[in-house]
Amino acid sequence: MKNIRNFSIIAHIDHGKSTLSDRLIQTCGGLSDREMEAQVLDSMDLERERGITIKAQSVTLNYKAKDGETYQLNFIDTPGHVDFSYEVSRSLAACEGALLVVDAGQGVEAQTLANCYTAIEMNLEVVPILNKIDLPAADPERVAEEIEDIVGIDAMEAVRCSAKTGVGIEDVLEEIVHKIPAPEGDPNAPLQALIIDSWFDNYLGVVSLVRIKNGTLRKGDKIKVMSTGQSYNVDRLGIFTPKQVDTTILNCGEVGWVVCAIKDILGAPVGDTLTSHNNPASSVLPGFKKVKPQVYAGLFPISSDDYEAFRDALGKLSLNDASLFYEPENSTALGFGFRCGFLGLLHMEIIQERLEREYDLDLITTAPTVVYEVEKTDGEVIYVDSPSKLPPLNNITEIREPIAECNMLLPQTYLGNVITLCVEKRGVQTNMVYHGNQVALTYEIPMGEVVLDFFDRLKSTSRGYASLDYGFKRFQAADMVRVDIMINGERVDALALIVHKDNAPYRGRELVEKMRELIPRQQFDIAIQAAIGNHIIARSTVKQLRKNVLAKCYGGDVSRKKKLLQKQKEGKKRMKSLGNVEVPQEAFLAILHVGKDK
């Protein structure tokens, strides 16, 4: 057991985590050169296309160190985006140490800090690694000082390597062996295994990735899931070398996968403890804190026949992605669907794409909203995650919106632009610290503004140099109103949104104009209105298509013309009272982009 090392690789987006993992696998011979490809751990098509890691992946390698011993390295490659920070904290719970990879050209960025503090809070050994030293812009000395200055860990001795060219990888492996502590645990105690991740295999059922904390797990053992009390037989178990390899035993301290023929998706929730059926452990391992979704949106299948398939797909996906929340919802405009909770907009996009690709569904998303705390006049406090759930205005004492604490790191040159952006987003500055050429800014900004397009705007005002990390801070009273969109006097529930009162006229006008472009012209006028309660704040009209009824009249009597026009007018009036307007798909998507195009 003293030769096992469990660690995660953490870093900011694009600092080279996945490439470093590739090199470690190659150096330790986990895959033959023929099977090796770039970012071999990013196995999902989506990950390859976008060039980002979404799912944390684990690998077991054997490394023969310079002291002649062979060490077993279990490592987990984690995502860097703030939306997937939950994957990172789960991976860290299974480890004793973490490699903090920092790009020697870019230096410390916001995610570097956030992930590093998560690791330190969990009492992990953090080993800094300076990557990308082959770049002409690399300045390892400056970056090492930056790490000490901003993060506060000793980095002068940090290994300098280049994951792309393979320089210094041996040193990284030696560092891992010497710096990261071996796992602690009692091989003879009752079995306790922590479920780090699960996914659904159509042939095997639920496959779980586990870390054995105490005891051992053998093939054929009877195990019990502690939260549900259900017992299962272990059919297969093994490790990833990134390929799935079967073994007969998982020893104390190891990380591996287990198949117990669990058909039920909720059979082995992530963060749960497995123990042996005959000799159960007395206590549950401390799992992970549940993350609360920050962004909610309605997802609806385009054809109502897909509803069943959509429900199953969501179930399978939520097993693999523990931070996804969903509950059934129905809308008059869109039929039956689900209200889903996500950690951020990128997360939402990814989930939607995965559903469309892996499960072959066509979906519509409604405008994303955050959770508001609403105090009603009878003193009851409710949490509202969708505009349609908001009680009528005269029943509300106050609405409180969620405030996010945003930590930004950026070069001094862009400070002015970024502050202007934060103020525009109704932000309040709480802290500002200079580190050499970098500035660390802390702002409290309403979550609704952060979630919408803050990250994109921040990147564009700072030419990509600023980085962001945010988390929920508290609820705070604000003057929020619900804007309803009415088409010919009918409210369309899927188009409603909750906005700040000052922005309401502007957002309403923008939406109405956008809808006017997208709704096809009919035989009668279509009035599109935005309203707060009964007060109309914006309106536009899609003009009717009309025949020229006077074409056949040449000169002659005006009363004849009047009669024909009058007749047309009556016909249009009758059509309008009967006709209903189909709102096309694009109109719902337009809402997502309101305010983005500037």
Swiss-Prot record:
An example Gene Ontology CC term for this record: plasma membrane
Chain positions recorded as GTP binding sites: D14, H15, G16, K17, S18, T19, N131, K132, I133, D134
Protein name, entry field: Elongation factor 4
Enzymatic class: hydrolase
UniProt xrefs under SUPFAM superfamilies: EF-G C-terminal domain-like, P-loop containing nucleoside triphosphate hydrolases
Function: Required for accurate and efficient protein synthesis under certain stress conditions. May act as a fidelity factor of the translation reaction, by catalyzing a one-codon backward translocation of tRNAs on improperly translocated ribosomes. Back-translocation proceeds from a post-translocation (POST) complex to a pre-translocation (PRE) complex, thus giving elongation factor G a second chance to translocate the tRNAs correctly. Binds to ribosomes in a GTP-dependent manner.
Enzyme Commission identifier(s): 3.6.5.n1
Domain annotation tr-type G: ranges: 2-184
Encoding gene, per UniProt annotation: lepA
Superkingdom of source: Bacteria
Catalytic activity: GTP + H2O = GDP + phosphate + H(+)
Protein keywords: Cell inner membrane, Cell membrane, GTP-binding, Hydrolase, Membrane, Nucleotide-binding, Protein biosynthesis
A single BP term in Gene Ontology: positive regulation of translation
Subcellular location: Cell inner membrane
Similarity comment: family membership: Belongs to the TRAFAC class translation factor GTPase superfamily. Classic translation factor GTPase family. LepA subfamily.
One GO MF term: guanosine tetraphosphate binding
Organism encoding this protein: Pasteurella multocida (strain Pm70)
Membrane topology annotation: Peripheral membrane protein
